From Swiss-Prot:
<feature type="modified residue" description="Phosphotyrosine">
    <location>
        <position position="650"/>
    </location>
</feature>
<protein>
    <recommendedName>
        <fullName>ATP-dependent 6-phosphofructokinase, platelet type</fullName>
        <ecNumber>2.7.1.11</ecNumber>
    </recommendedName>
</protein>
<dbReference type="InterPro" id="IPR022953">
    <property type="entry name" value="ATP_PFK"/>
</dbReference>
<feature type="glycosylation site" description="O-linked (GlcNAc) serine">
    <location>
        <position position="539"/>
    </location>
</feature>
<feature type="binding site" description="in other chain">
    <location>
        <position position="272"/>
    </location>
    <ligand>
        <name>substrate</name>
    </ligand>
</feature>
<dbReference type="GO" id="GO:0005829">
    <property type="term" value="C:cytosol"/>
</dbReference>
<dbReference type="InterPro" id="IPR009161">
    <property type="entry name" value="6-Pfructokinase_euk"/>
</dbReference>
<dbReference type="GO" id="GO:0005524">
    <property type="term" value="F:ATP binding"/>
</dbReference>
<keyword id="KW-0418">Kinase</keyword>
<comment type="similarity">
    <text>Belongs to the phosphofructokinase type A (PFKA) family. ATP-dependent PFK group I subfamily. Eukaryotic two domain clade 'E' sub-subfamily.</text>
</comment>
<feature type="binding site" description="in other chain">
    <location>
        <position position="743"/>
    </location>
    <ligand>
        <name>beta-D-fructose 2,6-bisphosphate</name>
    </ligand>
</feature>
<dbReference type="GO" id="GO:0006002">
    <property type="term" value="P:fructose 6-phosphate metabolic process"/>
</dbReference>
<keyword id="KW-0021">Allosteric enzyme</keyword>
<feature type="binding site">
    <location>
        <begin position="96"/>
        <end position="97"/>
    </location>
    <ligand>
        <name>ATP</name>
    </ligand>
</feature>
<dbReference type="GO" id="GO:0003872">
    <property type="term" value="F:6-phosphofructokinase activity"/>
</dbReference>
<feature type="binding site">
    <location>
        <position position="300"/>
    </location>
    <ligand>
        <name>substrate</name>
    </ligand>
</feature>
<feature type="binding site" description="in other chain">
    <location>
        <position position="480"/>
    </location>
    <ligand>
        <name>beta-D-fructose 2,6-bisphosphate</name>
    </ligand>
</feature>
Length: 784
């Protein structure tokens, strides 16, 4: 396939020169607690390092291996990291090391590295591991001079390896490191928690039980908070935000109110480091005793423990770790003696580099604030995302009494449009509850625009959407029908129900529908109200947003299926599988699925390919069969080519590979739209929908009873995530950046990740580094 030169933000794209790491050596180690996705990071560092011409060394058993040296430091080969993407934990081991804390231990470590010429260190671990690496870097020249004085190394070695470069990647399920949106392993840990919560819900409902779930996280409440948000928990206990003094009474009142509303189960989530206002621990057993004593509810405690560290990494963690690994190698190759140690981090969908010690300092400041009971400051220091999650949870979990809600006298309708996508129901629940909290009357429209025209609309209450977060598909019902032929009837329904604003949750059809409603404003006054669309489609093809609700769940389905298929191919030997994914003309699922599953190739519409490309892929796979990895995996987007169909590619591979490998095909189909939503989709759907309702409330404020008509472009928008921010973009502006024929945006951010997929599959590719991390200050990073 031809390499895609993605458009760059700078005037001149900056490409990674092949073999720019020639003569350099990189050591990679994992330290501290293990986390799912560490292996994906190790794989990316090894393969990107080898691709650039550098030597890469495994350092086994973390810092202990660094101190012990010998067989603990081994050169890594390309094939060493095959088949590890789907494995949890870390294949190179991790251990706590007292020896490295002493200068004597670090002296041994420096000697081991200098003798092998390793002057680039990639550390995957938590804040303690990264702090140790930075100290080692600072002491490096002094350590080498001492080794030379002791006669362990010669003076030439001191001169040649005079400085050590250090780059960190944060591998921790706790997500407790300041400066990064997500640490490697957090998303997978959330998958484990949500799997347990979903399983517990059925047994709790059968018996009308209360469950107290204790999750990990040490002194960081991220896992507990997001779990509570994604499963609609009744109560959550966090170290950063202890409950008020009379929390026992308030919690029992909330639980009994929910039970009185016919809710058959209560879920309380407790972070293992939960404390009260006096910094005294709140344990799951204490909560159970309280509920049993005060309410007499049948209550059970489940401590999830190390289950959260285990299992297969999620698609998100594999992609995150692969991107971070590639970025870490580039950062090491670009480093100079003056460059401070950095940590590669994620902000929105962008890889950034941040000064390591600034991040460590801020992480320690959070703990200090908690120790000194400055809890509001601790929440702020955790970052915008944590604070946003906490505020959203509070709004959705606790309903004020009706008499305390200030009525807006506005009616807001919610509608699902397009194909079903996992997470739609979480978005509807969030919209309904935020709308009610803002004093609006909320209306649900059933079966899309067709149902709207037929009057399938009714008021929906707070309790009506209870338990919707974990439900897949669309409970309201959704259709691809556009509003065009029903405009008169829809306008009548808007008028008769006095609808003052409309929230549309859906895919490309929802976007087209919004454009049709915008065009009909001149003719129909009923459409002169604020309208906003939240993207929800597995295809991730809505202009104005880098991600859409449902795409992450579909990606996990593809990744899980590919893992099983790869296992089948490994057992059979010399077999290549062709997998067809959904997405219409958008290659997001095929490309990102290939990156997450470790595929050999992905055919997508956005990057035209010809018979020559197909033949070169066959040659590549033929060469691969001569190695120890005797299997192949190729993904194909369903609409990537009119003539090069899945059947055609299957037949071509079968014929050309005759005698070397055999071939099988698999069309994944509608299984990609189904299943329970992933934690990411539940959380994203909840937050983006809440943000959309805040926008509607702000627009409606003060307009009721004034007869104000909303006719400006900025009153009909798409809300999407763009790079680092949630943005409202008028559909009138988005028209310019839309390829209507193929139903995709004209520019797509993920195409820049395409070379990563190729490089990790052993192809040569032009990797555009224009967006590669410039070292940012943490303060600037937090303000964005």
């Amino acid at each position: 396939m031809s390499d895609l030169d993605s458009s760059s933000s700078s005037a001149y794209p900056k490409y990674l020169e092949h073999l720019s790491g020639d003569g350099k050596a990189i050591g990679v180690l994992t330290s501290g607690g293990d986390a799912q996705g560490m292996n994906a990071a190790v794989r990316a560092v090894v393969r990107m390092g080898i691709y650039t011409g550098a030597k890469v060394y495994f350092i086994y058993e973390g810092y202990q291996g660094l101190v012990d040296g010998g067989s603990n430091i081994v050169e890594a080969k390309w094939d060493c990291v095959s088949s590890i993407l789907q494995v949890g934990g870390t294949i190179i081991g991790s251990a706590r090391c007292k020896a490295f804390r002493s200068r004597e231990g670090r002296l041994k470590a420096a000697c081991n590295l200098a003798r092998l010429g390793i002057t680039n260190l990639c550390v995957i671990g938590g804040d303690g591991s990264l702090t140790g690496a930075n100290l080692f870097r600072k002491e490096w020249s002094g350590l080498l001079e001492e080794l030379a004085r002791n006669g362990d190394i010669d003076n030439d070695t001191v001169q040649k390896y005079s400085y050590l470069n250090v780059v960190g990647m944060v591998g921790s399920i706790d997500n407790d490191f300041c400066g990064t949106d997500m640490t490697i392993g957090t998303d997978s840990a959330l998958h484990r928690i949500i799997e347990v919560v979903d399983a517990i819900m059925t047994t709790a409902q059968s018996h009308q039980r209360t469950f107290v779930l204790e999750v990990m996280g040490r002194h960081c409440g991220y896992l507990a908070l997001v779990s509570a948000l994604t499963c609609g928990a009744d109560w959550v206990f966090l170290p950063e935000s202890p409950p008020e003094e009379d929390w026992e009474e308030n919690m029992c009142l909330k639980l009994s109110e929910n039970r009185a509303r016919k809710k058959r189960l209560n879920i309380i989530i407790v972070s293992e480091g939960a404390i009260d206002m006096q910094n005294k621990p709140i344990t799951s057993e204490k909560i159970k005793e309280l509920v049993v004593k005060n309410l007499g509810f049948d209550t059970r405690v489940t401590i999830l423990g190390h289950v959260q560290r285990g299992g297969t990494p999620s698609a998100f963690d594999r992609i995150l770790a692969s991107r971070m690994g590639v970025e870490a190698v580039i950062a090491l190759l670009e480093a100079t003696p003056e460059t401070p140690a950095c940590v590669v981090s994620l902000r929105g969908n962008q890889a950034v580099r941040l000064p390591l010690m600034e991040c460590v300092q801020m992480t320690q400041d959070v703990q200090k604030a908690m120790d000194e009971r400055r809890f509001k400051e601790a929440v702020k220091l955790r970052g915008r995302r944590f604070e946003g999650n906490l505020n959203t949870y509070k709004r959705l979990a606790i309903k004020l009494p009706d008499e305390k809600i200030v009525k807006s006298n506005c009616n807001v309708a919610v509608i699902n449009v397009g194909a079903p996508a996992a997470g739609m129901n979480a978005a509807v629940r969030s919209a309904v509850r935020v709308g009610i909290a803002d004093g609006h009357k909320m209306f649900a429209i059933y079966d899309g625009f067709e149902g709207f025209a037929n009057g399938q609309i009714k008021e929906i209450g707070w309790a009506d959407v209870g338990g919707w977060t974990g439900q897949g598909g669309s409970i309201l019902g959704t259709k691809r029908t556009l509003p065009g032929k029903y405009l008169e009837k829809i306008a009548e329904q808007m008028h008769s129900h006095s609808i003052n604003a409309l929230l549309i949750i859906g895919g490309f059809e929802a976007y087209l529908g919004l454009l049709e409603l915008a065009a009909a404003r001149e003719k129909h006054e009923a459409f002169c109200v604020p309208m906003v669309m939240v993207p929800a489609t597995v295809s991730n093809n809505v202009p104005g947003s880098d991600f859409s609700i449902g795409a992450d769940t579909a990606l996990n389905t593809i990744t899980d299926t590919c893992d099983r298929i790869k296992q089948s191919a490994s057992g059979t030997k010399r077999r290549v599988f062709i997998i067809e994914t959904m997405g219409g003309y958008c290659g997001y699922l095929a490309n990102m699925g290939a990156l997450a599953a470790g595929a050999d190739a992905a055919y997508i519409f956005e990057e035209p390919f010809d018979i020559g490309d197909l033949q070169s892929n066959v040659v590549h796979l033929t060469e691969k069969m001569k190695t120890s990895i005797q299997r192949g995996l190729v993904l194909r987007n369903e609409s990537c080519s009119v003539n090069y169909t899945t059947d055609f590619i299957y037949q071509l591979y079968s014929e050309e590979g005759k005698g070397v490998f055999d071939c099988r095909k698999n069309v994944l189909g509608h299984m990609q739209q189904g299943g329970a939503p992933s934690p990411f989709d539940r959380n994203f759907g909840t937050k983006i929908s809440a943000k959309a309702m805040e926008w509607i409330s702000a627009k409606l404020k003060g307009s009721q009873g004034t007869g104000k008509k909303f006719v400006s472009d900025d009153s009909i928008c798409v809300l999407g995530i763009c790079k680092r921010d949630l943005l409202f973009q008028p559909v009138a502006e988005l028209k310019k950046v839309t390829d209507f024929e193929h139903r995709i945006p004209k520019e797509q951010w993920w195409l820049k990740l395409r070379p990563i997929m190729k490089i990790l599959a052993k192809y040569e590719a032009s990797y555009d580094m224009s967006d590669s991390g410039k070292l940012e200050s943490l303060q600037h990073h937090e303000e964005l």
